[in-house]
């Protein structure tokens, strides 16, 4: 109510919930009752891009390695399944669809919000949601380029296009004093 007005508080609350639930849960929780213990957040995206990018020409179904100082084997990514690439492709496909839907709802709500609430809504929810949608699409196409060499150029072009959209979402939050 405080940040978005009484009229839109419930809808915004649901958008926040759906945004956080859009993240891919790549591994089931280790602790009972600890819902969504493992989510695939943006730092993991960066590590996937980096690690696969470094060995892009030599396909491996399990290309991701633990970060150097990791004390627990397998903890860096915690991806369930025998094939990291297929698990990531499946996870990103579900994830970008969920982020796309929440981003679309954010875009529909934005003009309905009173002017004084729009900047905070953009910076705190709408832009991050658009960013994660685009980043998820980008990683999906990057992984497809890595796995399917016959359509590598097309998928890399799409990956770059979505990275540029992700960058635009970040830039949309660069404005005057909040």
Please place each PLM-identified region on the residue numbering.
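Substrate-binding groove of N-acetylhexosamine-processing glycoside hydrolases
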Residues: 1-178
């Amino acid at each position: 109510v405080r940040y978005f007005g009484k009229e839109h508080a419930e809808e915004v609350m649901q958008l926040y919930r759906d945004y956080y639930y859009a993240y891919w849960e790549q591994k089931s929780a280790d602790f009972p009752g600890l819902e969504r213990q493992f989510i695939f957040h943006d730092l993991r995206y960066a590590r996937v891009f980096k690690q696969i990018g470094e060995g892009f020409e030599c396909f491996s179904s399990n290309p991701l390695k633990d970060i150097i100082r990791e004390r627990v084997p397998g903890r860096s990514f915690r991806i369930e399944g025998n094939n990291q690439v297929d698990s990531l492709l499946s996870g990103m496909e579900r994830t970008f669809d969920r982020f796309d839907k929440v981003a679309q709802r954010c875009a529909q709500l934005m003009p309905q919000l009173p002017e004084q609430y729009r900047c905070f809504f953009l910076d705190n929810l709408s832009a991050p949601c658009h960013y994660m949608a685009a980043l998820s699409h980008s990683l999906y196409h990057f992984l497809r380029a890595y796995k399917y060499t016959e359509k590598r150029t097309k998928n890399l072009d799409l990956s770059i296009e979505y990275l540029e959209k992700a960058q635009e979402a970040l830039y949309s939050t660069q404005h005057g004093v909040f």
